[in-house]
Amino acid sequence: GKILTLYKSYRNKYEGWVLPKGTVEPGETHEQTAVREVYEESGVHGTIIKYVGKSQYSFSIPEDTVEKEVHWYLMVSSGYYSRPQREEYFVDSGYYKYHEAYHLLKFSNEKQILEKAYNEYLDLKRSNLWGSKKYF
């Protein structure tokens, strides 16, 4: 029941705790991207349990506005070890309880997705499906 978060620090311009995410590579599905990015950014081997939803955001660069769409998945890992990907400016990573992760996260859209994913997790637990062979 803990949430993997990453701390990104990019040249003092971008700093804060985020959820793992990334860009779809040619020929990849959203699911493959999610599993690959979690591993690349944190060293964690995750297994998808359920699709949670998508979020959209944009940011400005000097010559344009970049639009992003992120597909989110509830995942499970076999342990609590993580290693931040320094090449992508991740300087820390860890697993946190829901309320800790919620308050750490920098972006409101990630907080909304976290809340939705956590409620999905609680529903599966209440139904005795979390950890069942149906999902593993």
Language model segments and positions:
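Short, charged/polar low-complexity linear motifs in solvent-exposed/disordered segments
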Residues: 22-23, 59, 65-66, 120-123, ...
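N-terminal strand-loop-strand
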Residues: 1-19
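Charged phosphate-binding loop/patch that engages nucleotide di/tri-phosphates or the phosphate backbone
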Residues: 103-136
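Unchanged
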Residues: 24-112
